[in-house]
Amino acid sequence: MNSLVIDCFNFTMGAYALANNTGNAEKNFLPILRTQLVSLMNQYKGYDKYAVWDTAGGTTFRKEKNSSYKANRDHSAFDFKAIRGSSSLYEELGFKNLSVPQCEADDAIFVLCKKLKERNHNNKVIIISRDRDMIQVVQQGYADGIWDNVKKGYIDIPYYSIVDFKSIVGDRSDGVSGVPRIGEKGAIKVLTGLITLNEEQKKIFESCKDIIDIRRNPNLPKIEEFIEEWFSSKN
């Protein structure tokens, strides 16, 4: 069975932003979200549907390594109570809601997709997200594509490691600075072996990779155990 995996906060905040633009988010949020979800369901008919949510405390270990991690995000325009409450709509439409305690959705999606592929290697797995961090799930072979529901297209998967690339150039949206004085062109030269990092740059690169590379999450075994038990409860 093919699988559809939604990065729920990423997707649902997009629907809330559209509702905000109407001047009456409280009234229009759920109808807009329902329309978008039904459209996706029509696009991916016959797919098993998973809705993956961020949970409180999920960023803790990354913030311990980098106090700037996601510190620059302003979510004041969003009603998170309403966004979290929309999980009932997902359930009504046949999605299986997954909330791993103290876990970012990125990490949960990584493990969920891995488990789906382990159960059936021929299972086509599509992630719904605008988050380019999800590229690493595809590059690890755990998903087959990432659908950007705003641009209405699949995110391009680069030939180079997105984890290594972002560990060099940084990720402004997550507050990860990257290696100083090396831009995107320089990063490509590093990744293709045209130039090398010095020892100090390598240390910075590795510290950034600790944040970006989901495989370096020390809580991954616990996440895997939780999702295995969650799967058992759903079958």
Region annotations inferred by a language model:
Residues 1-91:
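Domain-level signal for Mg2+-assisted phosphodiester chemistry and nucleotide/NA-binding surfaces
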Residues 20, 71-232:
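Extended two-metal-dependent nuclease catalytic cores across DNA- and RNA-processing enzymes
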